[in-house]
Amino acid sequence: MSRVGKSPIALQGAEVKLADGAITVKGPLGTITQAINPLVNVANNDGTLNLSPVDESREANALSGTMRAIIANAVQGVTKGFERKLTLVGVGYRAQAQGDKLNLSLGFSHPVVHQMPEGVKAETPTQTEIVIKGINKQQVGQVAAEVRGYRPPEPYKGKGVRYSDEVVILKETKKK
């Protein structure tokens, strides 16, 4: 059995409902509904969730670990939330959050406007910092990757949009 799948999930004050092959996790920040694979059993035991594979097949073992991680992320999302920080490095690179849109000035001849999906918010504490917040870890990471994709860090000067914890290894320029 999967090592990840064996460990129980502490609910941390979130409410869980199991119905029709789906799990609904409700917390102070919102609600997430996730379909449960039929190869995985989910049991609610007084504030903890335990997952186990239906049979001992390799696929069921793998899916029990995957489902455990997805449900644990949903519990963390509705209780604490997720955030991803981005930094803009470069002369004239700026960001500004306006409602559900993120306006980026990234050295193109036109401003880049990124529409935020439902459930994800962007904040700009400074003009060169972006904080993307939400309850769905997959959505937050996807939006951060899309924003970074407009101008990924280039390897010679390091200019571009990067994650705040990302280390860009700079190349040496060509010598004559």
Curated annotation (Swiss-Prot):
Keywords: Ribonucleoprotein, Ribosomal protein, RNA-binding, rRNA-binding. One of its GO terms (molecular function) is rRNA binding. Pfam families: Ribosomal_L6. One of its GO terms (biological process) is cytoplasmic translation. PROSITE patterns: RIBOSOMAL_L6_1 (PS00525). GO terms for cellular component: cytosolic large ribosomal subunit. Gene3D superfamilies: Ribosomal protein L6, alpha-beta domain. Belongs to the universal ribosomal protein uL6 family. This protein binds to the 23S rRNA, and is important in its secondary structure. It is located near the subunit interface in the base of the L7/L12 stalk, and near the tRNA binding site of the peptidyltransferase center. Part of the 50S ribosomal subunit. This is Large ribosomal subunit protein uL6. It comes from Burkholderia ambifaria (strain ATCC BAA-244 / DSM 16087 / CCUG 44356 / LMG 19182 / AMMD) (Burkholderia cepacia (strain AMMD)).
